[in-house]
Amino acid sequence: MGGCCAGQGRGSMQLFWKKADGSGKAALVAGFYFTCSISMNFLNKAVVSSYEFNYPFFIMSCQMVVTVVVLDIFRILKLIKLPAYSLKDGVDFLPCSLSFALHSTLSLIALHGMNIPMYGAIKRCTPLVNLILSVVLLKKAFPSVLLGSSVGVITMGALVASLGDFQFDLHAYTMGGLSVLAQAAYLTLVQRTSELHHRSTVEMLHVNSFNTLPIFLTVSMVVGEPAKIGMSLAAAAPGFTPVFALLIFSGCVLTWSQFMCAAVCSALTTSMISVAKSVIQTVLGFFTFGGVKFHPLNITGPSHILNPHSSYILQV
């Protein structure tokens, strides 16, 4: 009886998804991604800084292991339609996986030396890079004047906000800037793989996890993270274990929702959602984890997002 009800539930969800029109699907996916991503930076900050557990390669390795194990269990139980991993699929998706690995690691490093509001400000440069890549790599039409100006003003807001950061850390800002380039690259490649090769989100997520797991594990051992973790007192700290487990689980779900948003909507839309999310993140960041000292430029920069983002929504 339980299996029958579960099957009927999955069938109902699949039927609902098939009947939803293009704009309806896009709205659902965008909302899901927004919901998943809103808390991730705070979880990262809690684990990396508050608990002094700054081992980004180990953290990403754990997320990839959980993703691979869960998806393979679902595949074996035939709960999802998913082909087994193959070397050919891995090689085909390797450029995207390398960009993903670079972005994930650099983001965690940047967060360790940068407060959350300023990290969000730097990430607002991603739509500009996505806009350029959509023309160069995806061969899309040149953006309209309204769209181009919207993205340009958002990027300018990020630069203005950075001028008000009294705790400027060149290394952290460099890592944040490089993570922007890497994120724009892998989102664009996910969109291209979905459009040209018709790969499902779950397939791309599965292959990506297999591809990046050896990278994260190897680098983690090279930089000596296992030995440092063995001497770390973080695991014994009150509340660390559930927060760390939540970070790993949320990271897996976030990656899935992000891949799905890039495939169903677009890479540019995905990065614009991240920008919208960063407004809330910036406000909350002033009051959490030490926040950042108030400066008019810190408010002026993020406020640039409102009108340009509304213009983008009207166009899509």
Descriptions of predicted regions:
Residues M1-V316:
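Polytopic endomembrane small-metabolite transporters, centered on the Drug/Metabolite Transporter
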